[in-house]
Amino acid sequence: MRFIILGIFAATVLFSCAQAEEAWPRFRGDNSSGIATGKAPPIEFGPGKSELWRVPLASGHSSPCVVGDSIFLTTYESEQKKLAVVCVDRHRGEIRWQRVVPATQIERGHPSFNPASSTPACDGERVVAYFGSFGLICFDLSGRKLWEKKMPLAKSFAGNATSPAIIGDRVILYRGNYVDHYLLAVDKKTGKELWKVPQKETFTGEMACTSCPIVVGNRLIVHTARSVQAFDIATGERLWVVKCATTATSTPILAGDEVIVAAWNKMGEPALRPPFPTFEKLIEEHDKNGDSRIGHDEFPVLWIFHRPDGIEAPMNGGTVSFGHADRNKDGGISAEEWPRTIEELERFRAGYDSHGMLAIPVDSEGMVAADKVRTLETMSIPEVPSPLYDGKYLYFVKNGGILTCLELETGERVYRTRTGGRGTHYASPLIAGGNIYSSAGDGLISVLQLGEDPEILAKNDMKDGVYATPAIVDGTIYVRTHSALHAFREP
C-alpha cells in the first residue's frame, strides 16, 4: 500500500492550499475526512456565547468552504428564485462579494432539499460551485468569473446536493438524476471536459446524488447509486465496483488501506420495517362499527418503511394504502384480503437487501466479491451523515442522535449511545481537539469526547435549524444555520 500513502500526500500537495491547517477547502475539509487539525474550537458556544460574529444569509444547505481569509458558500433566495455564490470575510464576518448564478429554472426536490445544497471547493486561486439548476461555475477569489459549464436542469426526487472536489489540475463532479448520470472531470482553469464516465445504473426516485468524491493515490472513490466505485483520476477508467444496497447519500472516508462507506437504504434494517398487525389485531383495535371488516375511515396508518427517529421530517416513510388492501373494492378489508396484502408487501420488502457500514480495500480490482468487503455493522446506519475515523475507532451518527463507535481493526462495537440531539440529522459529524461535534437538524450541536468513554461535554443550542455541516479552521467553528453564518471561537 506504499503507493497509496505516497499518493495521498502527493494529491494533498496538488489540491490543497499552501496554508493546509488554515483551510477547509471542500465539503468536510481535507479529502472530506471531517477532521480538523490545529487549535481546538470551543466546546461550549451558541448565539451570544464565544461568538465572534454572525452574518445573515439567504437560505442554503451548503457548508462553509474556508480558504485564507475568505469563506465561500452558495445561497438561494426563494422569492426572487435567485442562486448565488457568496464570499464572506473570515475575520470580520462581512459579505465581501456575491455573484448571482443565472439559472433559467430552479431544481426541485424533497421538501428538505434546498437548491443551494452543494458545497463549493477552493484551491487557493479559484472557487468552483455546482448547482443542479445550472451546472458548474468558477470564480477567482475576487469574484471574477473564470468559466462556466452549463448542464441540463437536474430532475430527481431528492434533489442534487453533491459537491465538487478540486484534485490536482481538475474538478471532479458526480452528477446523478433522471436526465443524466455520470462522473465528470474538467480542467480547473478552463472548465474544459477532460473525461466523462456514464453510470450504468439507471437513476431512480430512490437514489440520491449527495456524495463527494475522495482521492486515494491515483484513485477516485465515489459513493454512487447502488454501488461504490473507484476510477483512475487521469483517465476516468473504472478500476473497481462494489455493488451494495445503497441510495448513496453519504460521502466515503479513508481509514488506513480501506475505504469506509455508510451504505443505507430505506428498508435496510428491521427498525425501518415496522411489523404489520394481524387481521385479528386490526379488528380488535380499529373495527369501530363491529362489522368484522376494516373500512376506509377505520384503516390506521401502517408503515411499509419508516424513519422512527426522524418522524418530524416531511415524507419520512411510506404507508400501506387502503385501496391496495381493499382488493375487491367493496369498501372494506376482509379476513381473506389482509393476509394476501401482507404477503405482497413482505415480498416487496424482501427486494431490498440489508445495508451496512462497509470497509472496502482501496487496492481492489474489477467487480469486487462480497467476501472481499467487510461489513462492520448492519444496525443504526446513518442515512445522510458521513462517518469519522480517528486512527483507531470509527464513529457514525444517525437520526435521533444515535452515535455508534466501532474498533476498525476488529469491527467490534465499542458503544452505542445518544448524543443528546434528537430528530433528523443532515449535517455530518466532525472531529476537532479530541472531541466529536455532532449537529442535529433542529440546531442542537453536541460535543462528546473521543475514545471509549463517550461523555457528553456540551449541548449547544443554535436556536435555528442546522442542515449544513460546519467547518472548523484554526480554533474557529463556522456554523451555518437556516438564516445565518456564525463564527465561534474561545475569547
Regions found by a protein language model. Give the residues of each.
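Bacterial N-terminal signal peptides
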Residues: 5-14
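Noncatalytic, solvent-exposed loop/strand surfaces
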Residues: 17-491
